[in-house]
């Protein structure tokens, strides 16, 4: 989801109306209105928030979740689902979401109505990320008739694709998306440039911290290849970093592996 292009709809009023549907205390509603109008500080300059909740506001994440709940989740559950022919599911994280359908006709119908729904509340879909794909247990069979392959999609940094388990059963597998992987590798390269003058103990401590965080998020089943590739990239970057700190080469690859 991306922001709307115009100020046709006052989203602050919709936010208040959504909250009023669950909270009747006028004192709380008054505080919500004051928070929405409080404004934010940007580079030591005050910016008023006449529209939305304001980027950087302490209440912005909560307000955004409430807004998305009523605009999308509640609408999908209470209005859309009863009108569909088959099964449908919705997974939402912040302003990213994936919707699954049993029938293509339901997906096409929902996609058209979703655009109108978002526009009515001052939002719009990110066209580059929004698409209909053939995916699931029977996707390969259906795609083979047209000579195509099942689609893939990226969600929360993972590329999801159709595959099979060791027993030959259908299974959705996930791997680190190429975009996220390349971005993280670039960040490592830039970090190495800043750490050239650091002590080896400090460098390894920092890299271990990064690797631990990376493993905790991306360390899932079927993602071993990308995890191993990222670890190798970090090691290679460290190897080059240590050998560039002086005119004389500090380590060869074997010595480097023994050292770490």
Regions found by a protein language model. Name each.
Residues 47-55, 171-173, 189-203, 214-226, ...:
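Short, solvent-exposed helix-loop connector elements
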Residues 37, 125-197:
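A conserved non-catalytic segment of reverse transcriptases
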Residues 23-24, 115-123:
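A common structural junction motif
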Residues 1-9:
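Single conserved hydrophobic/aromatic residue that forms the stacking wall/gate
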Residues 224-260:
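A terminal-accessory region detector
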Residues 29-45:
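Reverse-transcriptase-like RNA-dependent polymerase core
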């Amino acid at each position: 989801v991306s922001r709307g292009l115009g100020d046709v709809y006052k989203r602050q009023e919709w936010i208040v109306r959504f909250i009023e549907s669950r909270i009747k205390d006028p004192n709380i509603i008054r505080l919500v209105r004051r928070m929405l109008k409080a404004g934010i500080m940007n580079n030591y300059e005050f910016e008023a928030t006449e529209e939305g909740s304001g980027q950087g506001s302490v209440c912005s994440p909560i307000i955004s979740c409430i807004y998305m709940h009523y605009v999308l989740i509640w609408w999908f559950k209470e209005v859309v689902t009863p009108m569909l022919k088959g099964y449908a599911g919705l997974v939402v994280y912040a302003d990213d979401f994936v919707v699954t359908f049993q029938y293509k006709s339901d997906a096409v119908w929902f996609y058209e109505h979703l655009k109108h729904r978002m526009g009515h509340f001052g939002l719009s879909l990110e066209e580059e990320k929004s698409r209909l794909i053939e995916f699931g247990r029977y996707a390969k069979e259906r795609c083979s008739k047209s000579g195509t392959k099942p689609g893939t999609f990226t969600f929360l940094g993972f590329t999801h694709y159709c595959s099979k388990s060791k027993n030959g059963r259908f299974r959705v597998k996930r791997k680190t998306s190429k975009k996220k992987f390349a971005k993280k590798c670039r960040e490592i390269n830039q970090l190495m440039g800043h750490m050239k003058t650091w002590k080896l103990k400090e460098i390894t401590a920092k890299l271990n911290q990064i690797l631990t965080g990376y493993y905790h998020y991306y360390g899932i089943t079927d993602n071993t290849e990308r995890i191993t590739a990222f670890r190798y990239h970090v090691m290679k970057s460290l190897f080059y970093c240590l050998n560039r700190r002086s005119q004389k080469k500090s380590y060869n690859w074997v010595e480097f592996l023994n050292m770490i």
